[in-house]
Amino acid sequence: MASSVVFAATGSLSVPPLKSRRFYVNSSLDSDVSDMSVNAPKGLFPPEPVPYKGPKLKVAIIGAGLAGMSTAVELLDQGHEVDIYDSRTFIGGKVGSFVDRRGNHIEMGLHVFFGCYNNLFRLMKKVGAEKNLLVKDHTHTFINKDGTIGELDFRFPVGAPIHGIRAFLVTNQLKPYDKLRNSLALALSPVVKALVDPDGAMRDIRNLDSISFSDWFLSKGGTRASIQRMWDPVAYALGFIDCDNMSARCMLTIFSLFATKTEASLLRMLKGSPDVYLSGPIKQYITDRGGRIHLRWGCREILYDKSADGETYVTGLAISKATNKKIVKADVYVAACDVPGIKRLLPKEWRESRFFNDIYELEGVPVVTVQLRYNGWVTELQDIELARQLKRAVGLDNLLYTPDADFSCFADLALASPADYYIEGQGTLLQCVLTPGDPYMRMPNDKIIEKVAMQVTELFPSSRGLEVTWSSVVKIAQSLYREAPGKDPFRPDQKTPIKNFFLAGSYTKQDYIDSMEGATLSGRQASSYICDAGEELAELNKKLSSSATAVPDELSLV
């Protein structure tokens, strides 16, 4: 979708320059993957799996998103046979991207890698993708109306927890009174306990799932202004909902890691598009080890039966591609779906089980991702003339938050992920995440572009006079699951009551939040359950094979 939007230019601005101080921070993934797990919650940082010595299993995975691919990598490493099926034309799921007819890379969302993404970094190192991450300055930057900038600046010679305490005490995003009350609330949180007892702190944090972060924060002395100016943008960026509607568990999980690990708050972004620099290397790793990925093959139905003792088991997957249909049979079946996907897939009869019925208590959050290409550099606040030239990229190279627009977080991908997004002779490519996305789902794309572009000029007055030369809009009706108070108990374990059927996905039970890290961790947990049950699963398949009636592999479309 192309568009042309122009706003009148204004005079020069007087904006305080950003500090250029730099302090050494350990940004090596080699050390991060090992160091992050030291004195940390065991649920977030599971040990390396022991070598599998049981029978080789044939595994069919539904879904080629990060959870499905994580599961596949772990199972292939243990010697199993893996096939992945996905109805899409590209891999990656919510972390996927594709190229349009004009050569533009379109993403499903804005993907930022927090320093505490230990399991995802481990996966990226395994597949050789760690070199595809670009480390950003160790600051969290807030863009306020009229171009004023607030920061949580973690750049300090002394690490956790001192660097974090200092960042909150000196931030210019909050007024002195709000900073004081903010510090008081955090001092009274399980975050402090995490410094000496990380597993105990995580248990305390889980127990706070039933209340919203706002209710918890205000009860500990925090202020509404702190929520509005700082924590709401962060909450929207993490889970696409605000602090009033987000469980305290989610925010405090992040805080506990930020407080105890110096690098946890350090941000990274991919060199370029996820399809090339994240999903691509994982796919290569899978296929190099004999795994197979079948795109455009969607699962229409889970086939199942019951044994004489009334136990349910899966007998196959009915899948289709255009007019072709077939039955896939395996020893093990894994549904690596998102919330709406798993609800569509599960047989209605399975809802008689509380385990499966609980999943229907979860719902996804709508989100809209907008890309805007400009003929200049929107985030260059110091020099308007420099912002108008197109010989070199200038501006803010980091994830940006804002409390003053409908998009809570955004970035200039031409700066932050230049390999695929910087185009010679063109300027900024803003990628903005509209949260909550509900008001925009029915809005025409051109109206969305116009509204977002107007809000950009309110944040960056220096961008007035620049033209939007190209744009795209991606709407996802149900993205991350809504991590509202009281929903955590409804998240299912990866191991289900059906012996040969497992789940994976960031919505499933794991100690991190719904995210890329959560998806990766869920895949590790699913693989671990499968390997633990290897002997039993192989025996079950022998029993099913001996008693099953012949079913043709290929079915014609009726």
UniProtKB/Swiss-Prot annotation:
Highly expressed in leaves. Expressed at low levels in flowers and siliques. Residues 1-27 form a transit peptide. Lipophilic quinones such as decyl-plastoquinone or decyl-ubiquinone. This is Zeta-carotene desaturase, chloroplastic/chromoplastic. Plays a crucial role in plant growth and development. Is essential for the biosynthesis of carotenoids. Carotenoids are involved in different physiological processes, including coloration, photoprotection, biosynthesis of abscisic acid (ABA) and chloroplast biogenesis. Catalyzes the conversion of zeta-carotene to lycopene via the intermediary of neurosporene. Shows stereoselectivity toward trans C15-C15'zeta-carotene double bond. Its EC number is 1.3.5.6. It is found in: Plastid, Chloroplast; Plastid, Chromoplast. The lineage of its organism: Eukaryota, Viridiplantae, Streptophyta, Embryophyta, Tracheophyta. It holds the Pfam family Amino_oxidase. NCBIfam families: zeta_caro_desat (TIGR02732). GO terms for molecular function: 9,9'-di-cis-zeta-carotene desaturase activity. Keywords: Carotenoid biosynthesis, Chloroplast, Chromoplast, Oxidoreductase, Plastid, Transit peptide. Pathway: Carotenoid biosynthesis; lycopene biosynthesis. It comes from the Eukaryota. Belongs to the zeta carotene desaturase family. GO terms for cellular component: chloroplast; chloroplast envelope; chromoplast. It catalyses: 9,9'-di-cis-zeta-carotene + 2 a quinone = 7,7',9,9'-tetra-cis-lycopene + 2 a quinol. GO terms for biological process: 9,9'-di-cis-zeta-carotene desaturation to 7,9,7',9'-tetra-cis-lycopene; carotenoid biosynthetic process; lycopene biosynthetic process. Its cofactor is decylplastoquinone; 6-decylubiquinone. Disruption phenotype: Albino seedling due to defect in pigmentation, growth arrest shortly after germination, altered leaf development, and seedling lethality.
